[in-house]
Every structure is written in structure tokens, then in C-alpha cells.
Swiss-Prot record:
Subcellular location: Plastid, Chloroplast thylakoid membrane
Coiled-coil intervals: none
GO biological process, one term: electron transport coupled proton transport
Binding positions ([4Fe-4S] cluster): 43-44, 108, 139
Record NCBIfam families: nuoB_fam, PRK06411.1
This protein's name: NAD(P)H-quinone oxidoreductase subunit K, chloroplastic
Subunit structure: NDH is composed of at least 16 different subunits, 5 of which are encoded in the nucleus.
Keyword entries, A-Z: 4Fe-4S, Chloroplast, Iron, Iron-sulfur, Membrane, Metal-binding, NAD, NADP, Plastid, Plastoquinone, Quinone, Thylakoid, Translocase, Transport
Amino acid sequence: MNSIKFPVLDRTTKNSVISTTLNDLSNWSRLSSLWPLLYGTSCCFIEFASLIGSRFDFDRYGLVPRSSPRQADLILTAGTVTMKMAPSLVRLYEQMPEPKYVIAMGACTITGGMFSTDSYSTVRGVDKLIPVDVYLPGCPPKPEAVIDAITKLRKKIAREIYKDRIRPQRGNRCFTTNHKFFVVGSPHTGNYDQELLYAPSSTSEISTETFFKYKSPVSSNELVN
């Protein structure tokens, strides 16, 4: 058999040869073609929707919005996440193929926002449900900030190795797709001392400790398994 002669690289051919690794080639192809899943629940999604217009044109970053989680590799949670919506969000994330990424957009998604103080149905941070790669604060963040978050995610993907793509099993997560909620009753029963309620006006200065009689058979109102 004739021996195979490899061409000698000279100055005329060195510019047409690309030296890379399979890992870098895979990272480059993924960061240049992110397919986000449209998941908006509040006003933050209005800012994300403005990226589709000609002013910002997020198509130049290779973003192709998808409506199916099985065709997406990026989910951008924009808006408030409630307890009732949490199992659906986890189910969508689990249906996305690996490798997959998450951008938490807005204060309501990251910490619960203004609804986290007195709302019983708001999740205080989406990272309690699914792992988050990039946090994007704001109320709501501007479209320029969304582009900056996508750029940071692209830089993270470019530095990934194969072991980084294998997501560890979620530990200490609050919800799963088959999670059952059990609400513990509040220790504050609201029972008042009838004698104090019908006391004359001269006894208006009553200490707070003696006005309410609370029973505390259980701990404070919380969600338990």
C-alpha cells in the first residue's frame, strides 16, 4: 500500500487550520445557540419580551425562544413564583435535556420581592426549587441587564468542562413533582379575654401581655413534609 503523506504546514496554510479540543468546540456551539424557555409570570417578562424587537434584537446572540421544555436548554424565570406554581416549574426544569441553565430575573424571583414579607403563598427564592446559574436583580431589570446576564452565562459556558455539565442531585430542595403540602396551624388563635373587652373606659391602659391569650401547641406557621 502506498504510504500516506501528510501535507507540510507552511505560511500559506496556517491561517486555515483551527487547533481546538472537542470540549471547547462543544462549548462554543452551545453558547452560540441558547434556546430559552418562555416562562414569565409577572412584569419582569414584559422587559424580556422587549428583547424580541428590533432595538435589542436578541437573535444576534443565537437565542431561539421555545415553548416546549424538551427543546430548550435555558429557562429564564421572570416574575413571582408561588407555592401553587412551584411543582409545575420543577416539572418543566426536569423535562429539559442536559446541559441546562437557569437565569433568575427580578427581585421577586430571587428573594420573593415585596411579596415575601406578608404573603403565605410566595416562594422566597427560586433557588430553593431549581439550581440557578445567573442572578439578575432589579424590579424589573432593564433589557440591557438581561443581555448582560446572557453574556455572563455565555462566558460561564465557555469555561465549562465535562464534569461541570453533570448536575449533582438536588439536595435539600423544598419541592418535587410529587410533593405533598401539609400546612401547620397558626399558634395565634385570636382568643381575647372577654373581661378586658367589656371593661370600662377607665381601664384603657392595659399591657399587651394581658390583653391577648394565645395558645402555642405547635410552632409558627410553616410548611413541613
